[in-house]
Amino acid sequence: MHGLLLAAGLLSLPLRALGHPNPNPQMHTLSRRGAVDLDAFRLGQNAEYSNTASVASNPPALSIRSTQSYVDVAKDLVKTTLPDATFRVVNDHYVGTNGVAHVHLRQTVHGIDVDNADFNVNVKDGKVFSFGNSFYKGKIPEENPMVKRDHADPVKALKGVVSALKLPVKTEKASAAISAQSQGQDAVVFKGTSGALSDPKGELVYLIKPDGELSLTWKVETDVGDNWLLSYIDAKDGKNIHGVVDYVADATYQVYPWGINDPTEGEREVFTDPWDGNASEFTWISDGRTRYPTTRGNNGIAQDNPSGGNQYENNYRPMSDDLRFEYPYSTDMSPPDSYIDASITQLFYTANVYHDLLYILGFTERAGNFEYNNNNQGGRGNDYVILNSQDGSGTNNANFATPPDGQPGRMRMYTWTTSRPNRDGSFEAGIVIHEYTHGLSNRLCGGPSNSRCLNALESGGMGEGWGDFMATAIRLKAGDTRETDYTMGEWAANQQGGIRQHPYSTNLQTNPLVYTTVNQYREVHDIGTVWASMLYEVLWNLIDKHGKNDGPKPELRDGVPTDGKYLTMKLVIDGMALQPCNPNFVQARDAILDADEALTGGENKCEIWAGFAKRELGTGARYDRSRRTGSTDVPQECQ
C-alpha cells in the first residue's frame, strides 16, 4: 500500500503579542443576518447544575442506586426530583473515557417535547455524580393540543418564519407532508419551496419562553447556508417568534496549528501516513468500505466550493492514484484558485489531525464525534465533516454547522480580502481548530442528539471561548512559559495585534478581563474572550504543576494525560459533557472541577480554583441575568 503524502507546514517561530491590539469591529459581526438581528431571538438560560459536591450532601440523590443500568439511575433521579414531570430518555447516552456515563432526558407535555427542557444526569460507579436540569416547573396546560387541534397549520408557520426573519426562501408553492424521520407527533417536511439548501422541516413542540411561560410552537428548520436555523414560532397565531437557534457558528479570527501558525513562520513539509491508527482505524482515505485516491475518508471530505452552494460530492478535489498530495503554494500566488489543490490538502490534513487528537482525549463515536462509519463503536454514523475550501458564500470569515449526531458537520473556509494578494483561511490551522471545536462543544453539551445547548448569550460566548482556548493550547511551543502571550488573527486579517481586544495572557495588565467584564458585553466573541482568558490561567497552573508535553498527542497513564497541557484540554472536554444545557460561567467552572474529581480524584482542585478566582470566578461568584457578581475567593483548603 502506498503511503499517503500530505503537504503541510511545521511552525518554527512562535507568534508573540505585538503591543496593544486594534480590533476591527467589522470582523466581530455575524456573517449574514441581513436586516434581522438573530441575537435578539436567543433562547434564555434557565439551567441548574448540581455539582458532585452538592450531590454528596443531597440524600435523595445519594440514595439512588440501580443494579440494572446507569439509565435507570438517571430515570429514578428525575422521578425523585420532579415526581410530576413526564419525560423521555434521549437515545444518545454513553459512557465516557473517564468512566462517567451521560444520560439525557427530555421533558414532555401531552406527549409533545418541551424542546428546551432538558435533564442531564452523570453517573459514576452506579451512583449519581452530578446533574443539570432545565425542566419546566410551572402549570401544565390541561388541554391536549393534539385533541383540540386549534393551532396554525405548518405552512402558515413556515411563511411566518420566512417573513419575520427575512429568509431568502420562496414559499408560495409550499406544502407540508408527514415526515417519517422525526419522533414528533406532528412532524412535517415542506415541499415546493426554493432558496433553502434542503427541504425545510417543521415539528410541533412546546418551548419555555424567556419570560418563563410555556408556549406551543412550530419548530421550523431552514438551512439557508450561512444560517441553519431552528425557529420557534407561536403555533396559534403563526406570527410571533419566541426563539431561534442557529446550528452555524461564525468565527471572526484566524489562529494556530500543530505545524504552522501562518505561512510566514515556516516551510511546508511532507508527512507520510500521518494518521493515528486507533483514532482513524480506516486511515484518513478510507471509510472501511472504499479507499479513495483523494481528500476523502471516514472523518472528512474536502473540496472547493466556489459557488458557495450545498452540493459537495461532485465538487473538485485533488486526485492522486499514488496518494502523493504534494502541490505548490506560496503567499505570492494569485488568484487563490491557482493553489486550490494545496489549500484543500492543508484543510483535510488539519481537520483530520484534530479529529485524531480529540478522539484520544475522549471525543469518540459514543460521544457523538464526526465519522461516516462508526464501525460498531456506538453513536450514529454518516456524519463526517464536509470541508469546503475557498467557499464562495463569504469572505473574511469561517463557520461550522453542527446538526445532531448522524448528520454531517459542515465547515466553510473563506478567502480573506484584507491583504494583497488575498489570503486563504485554510492555511491557518487555528481557524480550522476553532471551527471544529464548535462541533466538539455542540455535540458534547446536552448530548450528541441535541445541538441547541450553546445558544444562549453566555453559553454561546463560551462556545467561542472554547475554540480560542483549544487553538491556543495546541499552539504552545517548547520555549513558552506563563509569561508567553498570544494574539489572535494577525495573519489572515492582516492586522497587527490581532482581532481580539486583548491577547491571551496571565498578566492582568496585559489582559484585564474578569468575570464582571461580561456585564458590559452583548456579543458572543467578546464574552468568549473572557472565558478563554480564564481557561488560559488554568492551563498554565496545571502546566506549572505537571509540565508540558510538546508532542502532537498526549501520553496517558490510566486514561489521564501525564502533562498539564493535555490534562487541561481533557478536563475542559470532559466538563463539556458534564454541564447542563445552556450553562453559564459558574456552572461550566463547576463542571471542570467535577471533571477533575472524576478523572483524578480532585488532585488539581486548588490549581483550577486559583486560575478561575484570579479572574473573578472564585467561590463567591454569582450569575444573574442582569448582573454578574465576581469573587477572587478560593476554598479554605486551597488558601
From Swiss-Prot:
Residues that bind Zn(2+): 434, 438
Question: Which residues does the annotated region (Disordered) include?
Answer: 293-312
| Binding note for cofactor | Binds 1 zinc ion per subunit.
Record Pfam families: FTP (PF07504), Peptidase_M36 (PF02128)
Cofactor(s) named in the record = Zn(2+)
The active site lies at: 435
* Keyword annotations from UniProtKB, A to Z: Glycoprotein, Hydrolase, Metal-binding, Metalloprotease, Protease, Secreted, Signal, Virulence, Zinc, Zymogen
According to the record, glycans are attached at 278
One GO process term, biological-process aspect: proteolysis
What coarse category fits the chief subcellular location reported for this protein?
secreted
Q: Which residues form the signal peptide?
A: 1-19
Q: Which InterPro entries match?
A: FTP_domain, Fungal_virulence_M36, Peptidase_M36, Peptidase_M4/M1_CTD_sf
* Chain positions listed as propeptide in the UniProt record: 20-250
Q: Where found, per UniProt?
A: Secreted
Which terms in the Gene Ontology molecular function aspect does this entry carry?
metalloendopeptidase activity; zinc ion binding
**Which is a Gene Ontology cellular component entry for this protein?**
extracellular region
This enzyme's EC code(s): 3.4.24.-
Family per similarity comment:
Belongs to the peptidase M36 family.
What this protein is reported to do is described as: Secreted metalloproteinase that allows assimilation of proteinaceous substrates and probably acts as a virulence factor.
What is the protein name stated in its UniProt record? Extracellular metalloproteinase 9
Q: Which gene encodes it?
A: MEP9
